[in-house]
Amino acid sequence: MKVLVAVLVFALLMCMFVDIAESRRRDNPEYPSGLRYDEEMGVFKRCAQTGGTCSKSKDCCIVTAICSTATSPKTCFYG
């Protein structure tokens, strides 16, 4: 019975820790609005609902977005 209680307390503490970490990341003033963090690439990406421009190829937020290298500033196309 003591083991079960210990496991439940541990699980609760882990859930609280993860929730606190997530809320800190969302509320962090260094986390600019209009950008999202791409964990795979380790960079902030500019978000746009439709269209928009990007200064670098990795600035497009939506996964299906492709930045044209022919135009300057590059144009984001969403597929």
From Swiss-Prot:
Record-linked InterPro entries: Conotoxin (IPR004214)
Modified residues (Tyrosine amide): Y78
Residues cleaved off as propeptide: 24-46
Transmembrane segments: none
Pfam families xrefs: Conotoxin
GO cellular component: extracellular region; host cell postsynaptic membrane; nematocyst
One MF term in the entry's GO annotations: acetylcholine receptor inhibitor activity
Protein keywords: Acetylcholine receptor inhibiting toxin, Amidation, Cleavage on pair of basic residues, Disulfide bond, Knottin, Nematocyst, Neurotoxin, Postsynaptic neurotoxin, Secreted, Signal, Toxin
Main location group: secreted
Cystine crosslinks: C47-C61, C54-C67, C60-C76
Subcellular location: Secreted; Nematocyst
Job of this protein: Alpha-toxins act on postsynaptic membranes, they bind to the nicotinic acetylcholine receptors (nAChR) and thus inhibit them. This toxin very weakly competes with alpha-bungarotoxin for binding to orthosteric sites on muscle-type T.carlifornicus (IC(50)=14.95 uM) and human alpha-7/CHRNA7 nAChRs (IC(50)>45 uM).
Additional notes on this entry: Negative results: does not show activity on rat TRPV1, human TRPV3, rat TRPA1 channels, the human ghrelin receptor, human neurotensin receptor 1, rat ASIC1a and ASIC3 channels.
Domain notes for this protein: The presence of a 'disulfide through disulfide knot' structurally defines this protein as a knottin.
Protein name from the UniProt record: Alpha-actitoxin-Ms11a-4
Lineage: Eukaryota, Metazoa, Cnidaria, Anthozoa, Hexacorallia
